[in-house]
Amino acid sequence: MRRSLLPALALAGAALLLAGCTSAPSAAEATTVPSSAPSSPTPTPTPTVEPRIVVSLDGIAVTDETGTRDAAFDDPDAVLDLLEETTGQLPEPEKVETLPGYDFSFVNYTWDGLWVLTDTEHERAASAAITGASVGGVPITTEEGLSVGSTRAELLDAGAWALDDAEDPATAEFLGLGGREAPGTESLSRPGSTGIVYTLFWFDGDTVKQVQVPANDYSDL
């Protein structure tokens, strides 16, 4: 059954009549609606920076919430100081057997996941070998983002090459990546050509087990 609209219309008419009989409020009687307080802006959350260690041909860089700090391999003391600051420890140097043809000796500083090789007096450039996926709990990679545990397929996609032209990169035990000329040197594998420095990857099957930086093709060290 439909409801009649008459009662509602009647009420509406009465309301209009009452409104017409009521005088308009004076300005003093006008109701003031309080303005709402301005809302405080929502603070932007500070981005979280994941600590990481990156090893390049030139040296080591550490990034964390305080920023990025780096040290060049040409300054072994700076490299060791940076790693001590990052990991909270500086291992005792381990003497390396003197190599034939060299009139100076070498020492290794070995962390779990990394070792740094330099001469005893720290007068010559250092080099590093990545032996684990992290050092002191901090992930460590090359500047390409590769690390211990990376696959051969990832290296080949990045442009890695076999050290010997006679080897197949798909099966070679060692692969090189990158390459930058070292003026004043001569390549041992490419006589007559300027030597290069590069990143060396050592494989166990198809998985990287060690990364050496910087490697070169002009010395037998």
Annotate each predicted stretch with a short phrase.
Residues 1-11:
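Bacterial N-terminal signal peptides that target proteins for export
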Residues 17-20:
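C-terminal motif of bacterial Sec signal peptides marking the signal peptidase cleavage site
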Residues 22-171, 195-221:
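Short helix/turn-capping signatures at newly exposed starts of structured segments
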Residues 175-191:
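Surface-exposed intrinsically disordered loops and tails
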